[in-house]
Amino acid sequence: AEVVALVTVGDWLEEELITGRTFFRTTVQKVYKGDIPHEFVLAQEGCSTWTYRNYPVFTYGNQLLLFLIKYDVSMYRDTYDLVEYPDAYELISTYSTVMYVTQDDSGMSYVLDALGVMTEWSQINQPTDCPAVAHPGQEQLLQIRDNLTKQDPVLAAIAPSQADPDRPVASPGDLYRLTDLEDYFARLSADYT
């Protein structure tokens, strides 16, 4: 990824039915890797007529931890007349790198790995180095699910509904503490400098 950032999805700008993309104005809350404008355009694969694996199109106010690359329309330029956004970025690997951010009532931030891909990757690559899946208590879990529902009702269906320390990891809906991921990103940055 060129950029790893915590962002908030803003206004819907347009959709391109030809490419199956939707564009949103997006605000950066924090950058963990790379350089990106404070406000940029997020190109998401999916639109009103088609979604990737039935995964929902983002909505206003979604807080996301994203792994991004610069959006490149050059493969469409010769065939279609498209609006170009010079400050547009898109998800690397479509949805496998989308992580929704939410909080419990104490303000602790959690990241929902909606597809379980991060957990699966971390187990294969460097299990001792990667952050552990968080296992919040039942009360915290209900708060997290409630806050996810406020962002998007579909998200609450993905999050675990029972506090279960024996729940299999690498499952859709794994939760991580944002602070654990930030520490992990800092260690990765130190390793590559």
Which residues make up each language-model segment?
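Catalytic micro-motifs at enzyme active sites that drive phosphoryl/nucleotidyl and oxygen chemistry
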Residues: 15, 30, 52-54
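Residues that flank catalytic or metal-binding motifs in active/ligand-binding sites
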Residues: 3, 22, 62
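Netrin-like (NTR/C345C) domain of secreted extracellular proteins
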Residues: 47, 51-193
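Short coil-to-beta-strand transition motifs
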Residues: 1-8
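OB-fold (S1/OB) nucleic-acid-binding surfaces
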Residues: 17-46
